[in-house]
């Protein structure tokens, strides 16, 4: 509808204000969609609950809709960086503590922007929780309630997708060096069950799927 179009136009304009964030967000959107699509194809029971899907048959029937939502959640997950990034990561050096604390505000800022844009049901919580650990025991922001179950699997996929692209990307990032894909997969597996969702990490056991992503 017109309201949704206007919201997406505004949000897209925000991303365009910082090209590295736009590129990263687009890549994360594609990766999140790919991960959710793979889960639907190989383990649809893991996706039950997403957007209220009650069983695997409903997951299969609504696959296109679920993939669209996964893509949008990935595309706008970092929209909150618009408030902090221009003053931080163009300096060609590692972040100082105060700057990293500023970066840590972007999930809550993004959640607020998405709620104001009328995208509060799925995209806003995806933005808020994408740096929280799968087990709820780490990450940021702190002191937030558990992630809503109707979007949790997208957040689980988004968290992996965000780490995957961020850690393999040299563009516009002064606070860490890019890593080889295999190295990152090893790190995902090392933090499986704590930071990352086991069912999402298990997708990387498929060499053909890894080849598609790498």
Task: Mark where each language-model region is.
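An active-site-proximal "capping" alpha-helix that borders the catalytic cofactor pocket
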Residues: 27-36, 102-115, 180-196
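Short, charged, surface-exposed loops that flank catalytic or proteolytic processing sites
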Residues: 93-95, 172-181
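Histidine/acidic-rich helix-loop-helix segments that form or flank divalent-metal centers
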Residues: 51-74, 114-159, 174-176, 188-214
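Acidic/His-rich, divalent-metal-binding segments that scaffold phosphate/diphosphate chemistry
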Residues: 1-104, 121
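Residue-level signal for cytosolic alpha-helical hairpin/rod architecture
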Residues: 8, 67, 107-108, 161-164, ...
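Short amphipathic alpha-helical interaction patches enriched in hydrophobic/aromatic residues
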Residues: 11-18, 114, 168-172
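Conserved beta-strand-loop-short alpha-helix elements that form
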Residues: 155-169
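Acidic, Mg2+-coordinating active-site segments of isoprenoid diphosphate-utilizing enzymes
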Residues: 78-92, 131-140, 165, 170
């Amino acid at each position: 509808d017109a309201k949704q179009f206007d919201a997406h136009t505004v949000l897209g304009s925000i991303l365009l204000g910082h090209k590295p964030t736009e590129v990263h967000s687009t890549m994360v959107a594609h990766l999140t969609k790919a991960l959710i699509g793979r889960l639907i194809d190989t383990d649809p029971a893991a996706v039950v609950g997403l957007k209220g899907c009650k069983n695997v048959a409903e997951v299969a029937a609504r696959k296109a809709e679920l993939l669209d939502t996964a893509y949008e959640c990935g595309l706008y997950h970092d929209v909150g960086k618009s408030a902090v990034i221009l003053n931080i990561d163009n300096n060609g050096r590692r972040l100082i503590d105060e700057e990293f604390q500023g970066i840590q505000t972007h999930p809550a800022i993004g959640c607020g922007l998405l709620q104001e844009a009328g995208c509060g049901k799925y995209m806003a919580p995806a933005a808020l929780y994408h740096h929280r650990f799968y087990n709820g025991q780490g990450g940021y922001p702190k002191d937030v309630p558990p992630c809503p179950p109707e979007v949790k699997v997208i957040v689980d996929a988004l968290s992996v997708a965000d780490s995957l692209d961020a850690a393999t990307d040299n563009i516009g990032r002064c606070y860490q060096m890019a890593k080889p894909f295999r190295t990152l997969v090893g790190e995902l597996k090392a933090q499986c069950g704590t930071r990352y969702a086991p069912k999402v990490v298990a997708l990387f056991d498929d060499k053909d799927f890894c080849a598609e992503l790498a």
